[in-house]
Design a protein with these regions (language model features):
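Short amphipathic alpha-helical interaction segments
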Residues: 25-41
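Short, amphipathic alpha-helical interaction segments positioned at domain boundaries
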Residues: 58-86
Length: 204
């Protein structure tokens, strides 16, 4: 478990309990406790009812991410990012159709039409099949991104087993939560801020 991976996970979550942090990092509580305690004692994390990153933690994380970016092939990451943007548009449309009937200007989906819901959810397998090779390509430069394939697969399995909350529910590693965090990672790997990405037409 690295300093970078812990700080990045906490930043992406905003606020997270140690138990939930362990889950998202693919470890157990005992496994992450030493590094969490170290980062808290050094002032990089703030421990209260939940963990959050401190201003000095953000500065340290930016340094670590910049060091990480300095060793990557930027062309490979740029290609992965562009490929992701295309799949992201389709995933956003899927989520919109799950939440609203009739598109962005439609009405909230009451989920009382099993055939409609099944047709929307059926599109998730295609989205997943398209995003996994993109993650694989990005992970040749940033191996820690491999974890996103595993987390998306777990969420996909739960959705396909009928636990549809795992498509979009916040505060758990739902498909949408993990997707959002992967998007943030790719934006960061490009050396962009979210605002800069949005100006280029890449909105979440």
């Amino acid at each position: 478990m690295t300093e970078l991976s812990v700080l990045q996970a906490v930043r992406l979550k905003g606020r997270v309990t140690p138990a939930d942090l362990a889950v998202t990092l693919g470890d157990d509580l005992d496994g992450i406790t030493p590094i969490v305690e170290q980062l808290t004692e050094s002032g990089l994390l703030v421990d209260g009812t939940a963990l959050k990153i401190s201003p000095s933690g953000r500065a340290r994380l930016e340094t670590l991410l910049a060091e990480e970016r300095s060793g990557i092939d930027s062309a490979t990451i740029a290609a992965a990012y562009q490929d992701f943007r295309a799949v992201n548009a389709d995933f956003k449309a899927l989520v919109t159709d799950w939440q609203l009937k009739g598109g962005p200007a439609g009405k909230p989906n009451p989920h009382d039409d099993a055939e409609y819901d099944a047709a929307v959810l059926a599109r998730l397998d295609d989205v997943h099949a398209r995003v996994v090779p993109i993650i694989d390509a990005a992970a040749t430069q940033l191996p820690r991104l491999n974890a996103y394939s595993s987390k998306l697969l777990v969420a996909l399995g739960k959705v396909n087993d009928g636990e549809t909350a795992w498509l979009t529910r916040p505060l758990i590693d739902s498909y949408h939560t993990v997707w959002f965090e992967l998007h943030e990672e790719l934006i960061g790997a490009m050396g962009l801020t979210r605002e800069e990405a949005a100006r280029s037409g890449d909105a979440q």
